[in-house]
Regions:
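Extended accessory and catalytic-adjacent subdomains in large enzymes
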Residues: 2, 6-24, 28-51, 55-219
Length: 219
């Protein structure tokens, strides 16, 4: 219920002109929502050369038509390649290329100086927009459970087959995806009772800010 509120706020902030802080943070949150990245930490970026949404550098992205292509090294040294399609986010990325500095997600302060966004900025924005103490990590746990739910909803699936696309989307191992991201109720349902559950499943219609699978998971 808080997610549609956040997504409406993202649409509003990303529609603004200029490179204000709220628009830049909204761009990061949109990327978290769409691509399920880790939020990023500057310490890991400098010491381990591993990156998340807030620490992405210009060299990590390219624009191919209407897609934003990301190629970067994530946690545990895993090389990731992602394609993201979003009109407002693409418009922002085109604009931010003109700023000095290596960081992809920057804003202009009151003096006109370019400043990078950090994880604290992102988590504060999410909590304020959703009116609850949610953080960037919740996008990964939510996204993981939505993917797992979809596997269950669309046909008989083994536990291994349910977890595989989650691990792929998150850039995690199947073991970590199961332990730390997928809701335990979905794990239990996959092991026992999925056929009976599926026979009574009626997915709601999608709304502007929630997909059918998201609404089904909430229900």
């Amino acid at each position: 219920r808080a997610l549609p509120k956040l997504r409406a706020r993202l649409d509003s902030d990303l529609s603004k002109r200029g490179l204000r802080k709220d628009r830049t943070v909204a761009a990061v949150v949109r990327l978290l929502d769409l691509a399920k990245l880790r939020v990023g930490n500057e310490h890991y970026a400098t010491t381990n050369k591993s990156f998340g949404a807030t620490t992405l550098r210009r060299r990590h992205f390219d624009i191919a038509g209407r897609k934003i292509m990301l190629r970067y090294r994530a946690k545990s040294g895993q090389d990731r390649e992602l394609a993201v399609t979003d009109t407002r986010l693409l418009r922002f990325v085109r604009q931010v290329q003109d700023l000095p500095g290596q960081h992809l997600f920057q804003y202009l302060d009151e003096d006109g100086d370019a400043r990078p966004i950090n994880s604290s900025d992102v988590n504060a924005y999410i909590a304020e927009a959703m009116g609850a103490p949610f953080t960037a990590k919740h996008f990964r746990t939510w996204g993981a459970s939505v993917i797992a739910f979809e596997q269950l909803a669309t046909g008989p699936v083994s536990l291994k087959a349910m977890i595989a696309p989650v691990a792929e989307a998150l850039g995690n191992t199947p073991a970590i995806s199961r332990k730390s991201y997928i809701h335990p109720a979905l794990i239990a349902l996959c092991k026992d009772g999925q056929e009976d559950w599926r026979s009574t499943l009626r997915l709601p219609r999608r709304t502007r800010y929630l997909s059918r699978m998201e609404r089904g998971l909430i229900a």
